[in-house]
Structures are given as structure tokens and as C-alpha cells.
Amino acid sequence: MRQKAVAVLVLAVALGVMAPLVGRTPRAAAARLVSIDEQSPTRSALFIESAAMDRVIQVQVLHPAGGGARPSYYLLDGLDPGQQQSTWTNATDAESFFAGKDVNVVLPLGGQASYYTDWQDDDPRFGRYRWETFLTRELPPIIDATFAGNGVNAIGGLSMGGIAAYVLAARNPDLYRAVAGYSACPDLGMAQGAIMFSIANRGGDPGNMWGPPGSPAWAEHDPARMVDRLRGKTLYLSTGTGIPGPHEAEIKPQLPENIFFGGPIEAGVDACTTAFEQRLRAANIPARIDRNPVGTHSWSYWGDMLHASWPTLGPALGSQ
């Protein structure tokens, strides 16, 4: 019990330093594709007017240059998503990795500290967050129509985005065939303090998301309480231990941050992953969980995890 409490406290403190709602009827899912910037034959930026959020959202898509119908992998960012470019393409080799693969990789921009969910109330710092409505109702028809999507989807993400991937999959089980979390904590009972701290650390009011701790909305978004809704899906989780590894041997400006903050965060995530795995096992739900003996909460490892996850996710989508 003490180990669990310490892990929660460490995760809550460190995470904030590092970089549809039940009982409410969401606005009608209507979005408009404003424009497309074809940045290359295999990379496009879509500018989509979201009715739910009353703003234009940029979504970058990695896609084959041609061909027929294909699945889509919605890949979410961390606590501080890129504004002009997805951090997945800026900090990892995701673009070259997916080149030649028969899949659309959908990378939404923006949404700092949003947890990609529908907030109960508009926030003075962030404005109107209705990310679940956007990602699950407004965006998929546009992606499928524009990039020959065949309706087969997976969703994944790192840290905040990985938590959100499991939340969205549990709340929208018919939409996704596979789910991936890279250094994510899908057990909100353990992650609650970290989530609230991280939102406040970025200037938001955590109560505007799902209300105060103990509110019904927290339970209604907790994948650990909805594991049966993940049954039949391909599930993937990956985590390190917080112990510095090969990427800490690289001399780079963020090295101290990766070790002194990224290490404790990843240790907390590892403990949370164990708790979530126990929930899955108790329900007899299989999952592929890669536990790396070393690794901090940092982008070099998330790039590695993305590679390691594809032999699990690709076949589930019908894409190699």
C-alpha cells in the first residue's frame, strides 16, 4: 500500500513539472473541412472547423501516396502537444517509420492539458475543450472521406495521450479495434492526483474537466472501471522503470530533466501499469505489455515504443 501511495505521489508531483459527458447532450457532431495543405505526397495538414469546440483545429495526417481503402491510427500527443507540428513527427522518426505502410496516421495538434476529453465547463485558460466529441464524432468521417479510410481504427498516445486513448476506447468501444498506451497510466484511481496537478500546473482549473475528485464523471471516464468494454480489442501498453538507459548516454540539453523528472514519472507510470494489468487479468482480458528494464519518461523511448508496438497494432488493423 505504501509503495502504491508513494508511486502516486511521485507521479503527481513530477508529471506537472514535465513537459462526451454523462448527463449532458453534446452538440450535434458537425465539422467542416476548411482547407488542406498538402505538405508532401504522403503528409497533409487539415484545418477543420469544429462545431463542438467552436474553433479551427489542425490535424496532420501521414498517409500512403495512393492506393485503396486503408485503416487509420489516431496517435495522440502528450501534455504539451505541438501547435504547428505534431511532436510525434518533430521528436521521433514516426514519418519515416510509417512511410510505405498502408495506414493513415492521424495526428491532432493542440489541446494542452486537455486529456483529449469533453470538459464539463469552459476554462478561462484553455477555453472550450470538447476533444472526445471532436475525435470520435467530428473527425473520423472527414478522415475516411479524405484519405480512403475503411472504418477500421486504432487509437494510441503517450503519457496524457495514452491515458486518453484508453478512456476514449472504453467509452467508444465500437470505434476502435486496437488501443496503445506509451508510458501511460489508464488506472485513474492512481492517476487522479497527477492529472489534476498537471492541469493546474499549465494554468487550468482541474475542476472544469470532470469536476472535483470523487465526482461521478471521474468514474465514468476510468478505464480501470470499464475493462469489460475493452474486451475483444488488441491492447498494448509499454513502460520503462525510470532507471536511466541508453538514451541517457546521449549528450543533449534535456538530459538532466529526463533523469531527475522523467525518471520518477516513469517509475510511477510503471506502478500504475502493473495495477491496470491486474485489472485486465482479473477480467481475463489479454494485453501485450512491454516492460523495459530501463527508460525515462522522454521522447527517445516513446519513439522506440512506437516501433515495438507496431507488430501488435499493425495486424489488428490489417496493415503491416
Segments the model singles out, each with a brief description of its role:
Residues 5-11, 18-320:
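Non-catalytic cap/lid and distal C-terminal segments of serine-dependent acyl enzymes
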